[in-house]
A protein has these predicted regions:
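Short beta-alpha junction loops
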Residues: 224-226, 253-260
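C-terminal catalytic or substrate-handling cores of phosphate/nucleotide-
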Residues: 309-352
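Short alpha-helix boundary/capping and kink motifs at helix termini
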Residues: 19-231
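Surface-exposed polar/charged interaction patches
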Residues: 93, 108, 112-113, 210, ...
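A sequence-level detector for short glycine-anchored, His/Arg-bearing signature motifs
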Residues: 229-244
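N-terminal intrinsically disordered, low-complexity regulatory segments of eukaryotic proteins
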Residues: 3-23
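Short glycine-/polar-rich loops that comprise or flank the Walker A/P-loop
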Residues: 246-249
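Amphipathic, charge-rich alpha-helical segments that serve as recognition/docking helices
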Residues: 258-322
Length: 352
């Protein structure tokens, strides 16, 4: 049996960072979202025992090939749809509670399904909000989607769970690519949908209306380190509605996280404290806030960081290779086969 609880996470200045979710117990094998790994840099992201994405790391560790499985039987049934009454209930709690309440809403949705979608670990939901890009040519203009930029709010302390996303790294939601190379050196993190949406669906029109009214719930994404990508868990139609309206949405980023402490270096502490005392003696008017911040940094040894677990169950990857080969051939993507299987980046003719 699986049970869970959450707590609001604050930085040392008491600014809200997000919602920490602890999951304990046992999840039936193969039902939760999980990463599998094997030899030759081969990976698979699975849901309910079926692969959502296959991945193959390049041999020079400069990127990863992603193959999207459009045939997954549960693509459209991951979470229950957000209803109008859900939006109204959260609106009644006020603007200040909007983001935190959506974190709680999605935590419940992920865990209260008949088979919880999160494995027993520590999880974190953090907001990633529209931000300005520091480019002079964007001044006094309305940026197009390629110029959108999103980041987590700033925090005090050593919190290594900060996210960023560029609009130019959005992938098509109406006709997602079967195969994509993620460049770890020159590209940003990709935003990957799990299935193609219907651009004529009635709910898309409804979400466009909510977007114009400023009532669009956040898009829920999962950051997966091994894929260097954000995978949309909930909100494909909300995201597309925002793109069509030209109004940047907000995101909630789900990730695994861990907390550790730096080892104590007493000699370093003593050196810094002597230097600060000397600074105050020589300059009584020095910035006390700066000195206090240095002391806080000196004694605060905790740091929070994101991680992604995987189960090493793919072995030598022969079964993985058979699945990928059959899938790419069914969809006329054989031109990518050699690169995906071998972790290479040779020129590929357009496979359509």
């Amino acid at each position: 049996m699986t049970h869970y609880w959450w707590k609001d996470l604050h930085d040392r200045n008491d600014a809200w960072l997000g919602l920490a979710l602890t999951v304990k117990g046992e999840t039936p094998a193969g039902l939760a979202l999980e990463m599998l790994s094997g030899h030759h840099g081969r990976m698979a992201l699975q849901l309910r025992g079926e692969t959502l994405f296959w991945a193959s790391m390049l041999k020079d560790y400069s990127g990863v090939w992603l193959v999207t499985n459009r045939e997954h039987p549960d693509q459209l049934n991951l979470l229950p749809p957000v209803r109008s009454e859900d939006i109204e209930a959260i609106k009644r709690k006020g603007d200040a509670a909007w983001t935190g309440e959506w974190c709680r809403y999605f935590a419940r949705q992920l865990m209260d399904s008949p088979a919880p979608l999160l494995a027993p670990r520590d999880w974190l939901l953090r907001p990633m909000l529209p931000a300005k890009r520091h480019s002079s040519y964007l001044r006094n203009t309305t940026p197009d989607i390629d110029q959108w930029y999103f980041k987590t709010p700033p925090s005090a302390g050593d919190w290594r769970v900060d996210w960023a996303l560029y609009g130019e790294d959005f992938r098509s939601l109406t006709d997602p690519e079967h195969v994509r190379l993620v460049d770890w050196w020159w590209g940003g993190h990709l935003l990957m949908g799990r299935y193609p949406i219907d651009p004529h669906a009635g709910r898309l029109k409804w979400w466009r209306k909510k977007c114009r009214e400023g009532e669009l719930p956040p898009v829920l994404v999962w950051y997966i380190a091994g894929l260097a990508s954000y995978v949309v868990l909930d909100g494909h139609y909300r995201l597309h509605a925002a793109m069509e309206e030209g109004i940047p949405p907000s995101f909630l980023v789900l990730s695994e996280y861990a907390e550790r402490e730096f080892p104590v270096d007493e000699a370093q502490r003593e050196r810094v404290q002597r230097a600060l005392a000397l600074q105050q003696a020589n300059n009584p008017g020095c910035n006390i806030d700066g000195i206090n911040q240095t002391l806080i940094n000196l004694w605060d040894r905790r740091y929070l960081y994101a991680e992604t677990h995987s189960r090493a169950t793919l072995g030598n990857g022969e079964g993985w290779a058979r699945e990928v080969t059959a899938y790419l051939r069914r969809h006329g993507q054989e031109a990518y086969l050699e690169n995906v299987l071998n972790g290479t980046e040779n020129p590929v003719d357009d496979a359509g």
